[in-house]
C-alpha cells in the first residue's frame, strides 16, 4: 500500500503560481536608491552649511535624518537585489537618475530656508514612496509594499514637524 502524501515541499507550492517579474516594483526601488542617495547628500549639505539661531538643535537633527535615509537606502537596495535587480551604486548613476537636484552650498541661506529645502526633499520622497506603494500593490509584492508604507509614514511625520517649526500646516 502506497502512503498518500498530504503535504508538499516549498518548491512544489511555489511552482503553482509563477512569480511575476515585478518590473515596475524594481524600477521604483531603483529610483528610490538614486533619490535616497542624493537626498543624503542634500541633508549633509544642510548639516554643513547651517548657521544661525537653532543650529544646536538642527545640526544634530540632520544627522538623525541622514541615518534614517541611509536605512531606507540599504533596505530598498537589498530588496531590489532580493527581487533579482541591480541597484544603482555609483555617484554618476545616482546623479543621472535622481529627480532631486543638488545646489551649491551657501552659508547665507537661513536655517528656515534650509529647513524648507529639507521639506521639499521629503515631499518628493513621500510622493515617490506612495508611487512605490501603489506599484508594488498592483504587482502583488506585499514585502516591497510594506517597505514603502513604513518609509512614507515616517517621512510624512517629519514633514509635519518641520512645517510646524516653520509655522505652517503640513499640507500632506
UniProtKB/Swiss-Prot annotation:
One of its GO terms (molecular function) is ferric iron binding. It comes from Streptococcus suis. It is found in: Cytoplasm. Fe cation 2 binds at residue 78. Changing residue 59 to A: Decreases the iron incorporation considerably and induces Fe(2+) oxidation-dependent degradation. It comes from the Bacteria. 12 di-nuclear ferroxidase centers are located at the interfaces between subunits related by 2-fold symmetry axes. One of its GO terms (cellular component) is cytoplasm. InterPro entries: DPS_DNA-bd, Ferritin-like, Ferritin-like_SF, Ferritin_DPS_dom. Homododecamer. The 12 subunits form a hollow sphere into which the mineral iron core can probably be deposited. Can store up to 480 Fe(3+). Belongs to the Dps family. Fe cation 1 binds at residues 47, 74, 78. Protects DNA from oxidative damage by sequestering intracellular Fe(2+) ion and storing it in the form of Fe(3+) oxyhydroxide mineral. One hydrogen peroxide oxidizes two Fe(2+) ions, which prevents hydroxyl radical production by the Fenton reaction. It binds and incorporates Fe(2+) iron. Is responsible for hydrogen peroxide resistance. Does not bind DNA. Disulfide bonds: none annotated. It catalyses: 2 Fe(2+) + H2O2 + 2 H(+) = 2 Fe(3+) + 2 H2O. This is DNA protection during starvation protein.
Amino acid at each position: 500500500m502506497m502512503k498518500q502524501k498530504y503535504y508538499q515541499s516549498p518548491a512544489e507550492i511555489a511552482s503553482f503560481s509563477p512569480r511575476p517579474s515585478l518590473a515596475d516594483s524594481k524600477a521604483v526601488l531603483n529610483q528610490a536608491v538614486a533619490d535616497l542617495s542624493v537626498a543624503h547628500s542634500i541633508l549633509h549639505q544642510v548639516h554643513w552649511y547651517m548657521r544661525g539661531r537653532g543650529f544646536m538643535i538642527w545640526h544634530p537633527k540632520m544627522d538623525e535624518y541622514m541615518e534614517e535615509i541611509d536605512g531606507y537606502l540599504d533596505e530598498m537596495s537589498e530588496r531590489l537585489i532580493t527581487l533579482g535587480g541591480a541597484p544603482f551604486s555609483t555617484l554618476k548613476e545616482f546623479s543621472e537618475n535622481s529627480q532631486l537636484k543638488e545646489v551649491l552650498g551657501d552659508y547665507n541661506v537661513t536655517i528656515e530656508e534650509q529647513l524648507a529645502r529639507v521639506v521639499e526633499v521629503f515631499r518628493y520622497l513621500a510622493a515617490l514612496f506612495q508611487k512605490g506603494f501603489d506599484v508594488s500593490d498592483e504587482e502583488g509584492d506585499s514585502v516591497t509594499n510594506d517597505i514603502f508604507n513604513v518609509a512614507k509614514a515616517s517621512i510624512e511625520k517629519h514633514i509635519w514637524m518641520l512645517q510646524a517649526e516653520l509655522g505652517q500646516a503640513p499640507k500632506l
